[in-house]
């Protein structure tokens, strides 16, 4: 393969017509960059690297116009015509099954029904992109067609570096996104790098090519709400949230799961969302039952459903701060309260401040960023004040890992910090991982395992649902019972958006058992090939002190060793696709997060990889949590060591006596 032939084939012919944009499809707002003229020249040269010189004169002004109007060069002209969908794998070209499978995943991430801003390659989370521009998309797709089982495709922040010789037990694709050098690992430098075309914000499963629609977070949200009810509201383990009110904000790519998860958990929910198009998406999918722009109507509906003990998801089209004011003024009791606005990028459109409409937010981002930032800070401070008032009235508030509390701190509220000074010791309100998901799920190894049926057939998804259910013992732990019920009812709950996929929280041994069963089913011709994966938001996949590792209390919550070891270990053991990103769901410099994809083709080679990689991917996180003295992780490691004593051994801590430690420190500080 010659480079000039490859580039000529993709970009050298007659330029495709500049596309028209389908009405009703959301578009990304202008992105911040603050480039100098020299930077603009660099951005232009960087984009033109993909294009044969004969087209430079025509495309240079076009790319420059995109940079000025959008803050980024997207190369819209090179987007394929029409809508993209994750098609059945047999409809893709490729020299190996992994190359074709990755094409399914990429196109599913950019489906109009799935992606937040599909024309700008944003899958979810306001800024989470598959890659930076449509030239990269075309080149990645071409490399995936050429990829063999003796090669690995390397992708750096959306740029396909090339194909490199490897072997059958190597990853077929290795991805990294936004990994900044420490002194430049901040939002301003990232924005500049992204505008230059050298950095991509992959979020988690956007740039990791593993998004399965908002279903991917429904199970985690369901678990969080259910366990919040058990731990904070005194609900028995065999009951749900019937008769309870949950209030939150956001109905986007990830936050869109909130209403559906609350409904499955039995609750009544009111979810505020400023963008009516996102509400209509969830309403048409059946993920919210009703919508209104009236406070009184939303509350009236909620009271009716609470009295009837019926679950119901209500979308309120308006600002959550206004909604909370109304609830307080009218003495409406809220049982559970959270927020899922995109506060990892509050000043880039992720948080719409009180007092302006969604349309005004977009205009201010383009025309008056300074005013917008002031409005965001003012709104966040008041939002915090309202949460404090509801907390006094008996509401349980938790940060849903979207950097909301950090955004409040950045807006100038120092009293939100436990130490009253800075964020090093955490915040006065817990994150959902710190209080709920960490100790109840992650510490045992339960996390967001998922699979996608590459055939695109409903019968394959039905068969895998049944097989997964057979692998779960509902009497082992209450978590297993919850997971059993989840997958049993998954089809009835109509969770699929995009390709035929399923999310199912499982622990290390559960994941391996299900994975091996699926591969056996592929081998026997019972189902077509399957792509396994998980969210980066998992037991061992992410280091993030404000979210995934917020219940790590030995001081190592600020370290990123675990996520990197998890990523490297998955590469060493032969996972089909591995990804490592900066920022996750909390923002640049606040997280290092990784994930994987594993194609099940029915081979014994895949059985071997699964037997090594699946336990590692989860237990590397449980091991770190056990070393941090987390009790549930210690008991899980003891069980694992005993069950795997011929092959594995995880180091366990000796627990020091608190009185001895305090006495010793005091004596030396007299």
Predicted regions and their residues:
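Residue-level detector of anion-binding/catalytic polar loops
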Residues: 268, 333, 396
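Catalytic or ion-translocation cores adjacent to nucleophile or general acid/base/metal-coordination motifs
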Residues: 203-226, 230, 237, 242-245, ...
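Glycine-rich, charged/polar anion/phosphate-binding loops
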Residues: 321-324, 383-384, 514-518, 562-566
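Small-residue-enriched alpha-helical segments and adjacent helix-cap loops
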Residues: 535-565
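Short, solvent-exposed amphipathic alpha-helical segments in soluble enzyme
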Residues: 263-265, 328-333, 413-417, 522, ...
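Long, compositionally biased, glycine/small-hydrophobic-enriched stretches that function as flexible linkers
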Residues: 1-214, 369-517, 521-533, 539-543, ...
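Active-site/ligand-binding-proximal alpha/beta "capping" segment
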Residues: 313-341, 345-348
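Glycine-rich beta-alpha junction loops
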Residues: 276, 318-321, 340-345, 401-407, ...
């Amino acid at each position: 393969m010659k480079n000039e032939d490859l580039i000529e084939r993709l970009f050298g012919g007659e330029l495709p017509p500049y596309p028209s944009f389908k009405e009703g499809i959301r578009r990304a707002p202008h992105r911040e960059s603050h480039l100098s003229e020299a930077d603009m020249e660099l951005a232009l040269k960087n984009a033109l690297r993909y294009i044969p010189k004969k087209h430079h004169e025509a495309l240079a002004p076009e790319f420059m116009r995109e940079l000025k109007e959008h803050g980024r060069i997207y190369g819209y002209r090179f987007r394929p015509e029409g809508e993209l969908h994750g098609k059945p794998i047999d409809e893709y070209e490729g020299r190996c099954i992994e190359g074709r499978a990755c094409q399914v995943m990429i196109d599913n991430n950019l489906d109009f029904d799935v992606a937040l801003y599909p024309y700008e390659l944003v899958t979810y989370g306001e800024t989470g992109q598959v890659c930076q521009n449509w030239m990269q998309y075309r080149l990645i797709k071409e490399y995936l067609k050429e990829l063999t089982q003796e090669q690995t495709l390397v992708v750096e922040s959306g740029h396909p570096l090339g194909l490199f010789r490897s072997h059958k037990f190597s990853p077929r694709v290795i991805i990294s996104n936004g990994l900044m050098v420490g002194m430049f690992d901040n939002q301003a430098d990232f924005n500049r790098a992204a505008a230059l075309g050298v950095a991509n914000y992959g979020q988690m499963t956007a740039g990791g090519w593993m998004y399965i629609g908002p279903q991917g977070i429904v199970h985690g949200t369901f678990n969080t709400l259910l366990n919040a009810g058990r731990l904070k509201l005194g609900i028995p383990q065999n009951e749900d949230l019937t008769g309870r009110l949950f209030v939150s904000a956001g109905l986007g790519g990830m936050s869109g799961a909130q209403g559906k998860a609350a409904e499955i958990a039995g609750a009544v929910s009111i979810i505020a969302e400023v963008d009516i198009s996102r509400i209509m998406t969830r309403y048409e999918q059946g993920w919210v039952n009703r919508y209104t722009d009236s406070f009184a109507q939303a509350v009236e509906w909620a009271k009716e459903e609470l009295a009837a003990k019926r679950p119901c998801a209500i979308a309120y089209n308006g600002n959550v701060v206004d909604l909370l004011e109304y609830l307080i003024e009218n003495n409406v009791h809220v049982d559970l309260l959270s927020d899922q606005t995109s506060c990892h990028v509050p000043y880039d459109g992720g948080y719409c401040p009180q007092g302006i409409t969604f349309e005004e937010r977009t205009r201010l981002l383009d025309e008056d960023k300074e005013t917008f930032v002031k409005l965001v800070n003012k709104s966040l401070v008041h939002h915090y004040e309202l949460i404090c008032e509801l907390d006094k009235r008996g509401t349980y508030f938790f940060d849903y890992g979207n950097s909301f509390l950090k955004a409040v701190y950045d807006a100038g509220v120092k009293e939100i910090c436990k130490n009253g000074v800075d964020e090093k010791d955490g915040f006065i309100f817990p994150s959902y991982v710190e209080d709920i998901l960490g100790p109840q799920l992650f510490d045992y190894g339960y996390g967001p395992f998922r699979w996608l049926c590459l055939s695109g057939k409903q019968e394959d998804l039905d068969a895998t649902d049944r097989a997964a259910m057979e692998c779960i013992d509902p009497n082992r732990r209450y978590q297993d019972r919850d997971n059993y019920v989840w997958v049993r009812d998954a089809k009835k709950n109509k969770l699929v958006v995009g390709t035929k996929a399923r999310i199912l929280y499982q622990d290390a041994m559960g994941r391996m058992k299900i994975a091996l069963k699926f591969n056996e089913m592929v081998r026997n011709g019972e189902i077509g090939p399957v792509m396994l994966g998980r969210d980066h938001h998992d037991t061992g996949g992410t280091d993030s002190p404000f979210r995934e590792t917020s219940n790590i209390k030995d001081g190592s919550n600020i370290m990123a060793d675990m996520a990197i070891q998890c990523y490297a270990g998955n590469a060493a053991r032969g996972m089909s696709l591995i990804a490592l990103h900066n920022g996750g769901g909390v923002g640049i410099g606040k997280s290092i997060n990784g994930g994987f994809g594993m194609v099940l083709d029915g081979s014994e080679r895949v059985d071997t990889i699964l037997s090594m990689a699946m336990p590692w991917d989860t237990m590397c996180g449980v091991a770190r949590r056990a070393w941090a003295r987390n009790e549930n992780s210690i008991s899980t490691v003891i069980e694992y060591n005993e069950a795997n004593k011929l092959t594995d051994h995880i180091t366990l801590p000796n627990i020091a006596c608190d009185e001895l430690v305090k006495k010793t420190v005091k004596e030396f500080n007299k």
